[in-house]
């Protein structure tokens, strides 16, 4: 079928078509950018169907079901609309590969999925299937082709709801997806995309523990001989060390030959299975992923006698050396255990996994790659002390490309730093930032003044937050006109957006007065980079004192109502006393440069003239 949308087309004045993904069971599918949601990627399925057409009704039914669902392992609904005779379904874009494609790649190598992988696949699918069944929805097509492995976290995600429907009350209908889960598992284990019974024969061709084999046979029965709670318990209680000791010998199966359909075969005509190569550190109790097949009992017995003979010779000649080696190994193991901390055995993420996580975080913010790179480069320029004009110079050794900034490690660290800063913004500030609406910082000052605060108090609050997330920019530079032209100034503006909101909703602002008292006592907790502002009316010609009880990482500013005079500004000195001879609102700002929350108490006192010492 000819694609109905062209690349670069803007559909419904909103969706910018990026790529034709192909055709699924109902229609053509495209990758697009949602220009109303920070250019987030999404998929659009298009179906051309006349009114009342059966396919069109199925398409609408799928959209209605998706509309009612909200789960992180479902390609969630965004919009459904019609234009002329075409129906459009918009869903979240899931970056990854279908399990059908993953299985196809394995088959080209003469391999399939291991038992441990399929166990995990089943366990990870159970929460989303259970969620569907709570909604009285049967997915109806649990198969490798309708499930994707999401790149960012490796979780299986349901993407095709073509055959989904609400329960109609037919006996066994609530267990249809259990049967589908069993069919999907056997497909991944055997490489048979459309497996057929007898199931025992299929399962005999792969290395499985007896417990998992029996569980699969219960799923594959119709109706399934296991319910949802029992399946969950059985999967969680399967033994972890299930393989026979023959796997320890590291026997190698026959190298598979490639067949026309891409599935490898051994010389015996049976499907091959990947072998296990254990490292010298592996022990007999180590977790083994796959079991090799041995052709017949005779071969096993023969090889066992040979092995036993070799072991006897080794025992006779090397017992002393063996004991010494064991002692050394035990000592080394004990030393290693003594040094290791909990979690040391967690595998490090690959570069690809890290990059995918970073991309997912950036996409969630709705910021283009080019703009994000500009922010990162600006951060590195501040960190490395590089002048912006120098950044624009051309490097003759890179064919005219701009100078690259920092080492790969510095670039990665700055990427994380900028992401953390942007993710600290509220949704409204993020939208304002993504749409380049932050503008001139001075546009907010009239609203700040309505709170009886000046721009310097407001800037103290914003600067504290900005410096917490982006410390490579010196606080002294934040007020300079040159900084307002830098890319990172846009982040400052977005943080100012949030800071103003926190003042106006009075979550970080309070107006105070000494009506019938000479003393005010305040207290609170400051999160890292956070601040509070107070507008205080203090009678003139009186002695006034303030005392802040807080860790040294707290900072305080104290400004008079008028003029450029500064009493305290971002000061680590937490105590002050003196005359307050101006009428109006004095401004108090408390901020934190700590890396953890800190508590504070603030005491404000008026000392009457009669109580002052002569």
From Swiss-Prot:
Q: Where is the Protein kinase domain?
A: 15-404
Q: Which GO terms describe its molecular function?
A: ATP binding; protein serine/threonine kinase activity
Q: Where is the composition biased (Polar residues)?
A: 256-269
Kindly state which keywords UniProt assigns to this record, in alphabetical order: ATP-binding, Nucleotide-binding
Renumbered to this chain, region (Disordered) spans: 256-284
Disulfide pairings? none
Q: Where is this site: Defective ATP-binding?
A: 44
Residues given in the record as ATP binding sites? 21-29
Q: Which domain of life is it from?
A: Bacteria
User: Per the record's keyword annotation, is Transmembrane helix included, yes or no?
Assistant: no
InterPro entries xrefs: Kinase-like_dom_sf (IPR011009), Prot_kinase_dom (IPR000719)
Q: Which family does it belong to?
A: Belongs to the protein kinase superfamily. Ser/Thr protein kinase family.
Q: Say what the protein does.
A: Lacks protein kinase activity.
This chain's protein is named Serine/threonine-protein kinase-like protein E
Q: Which gene encodes it?
A: spkE
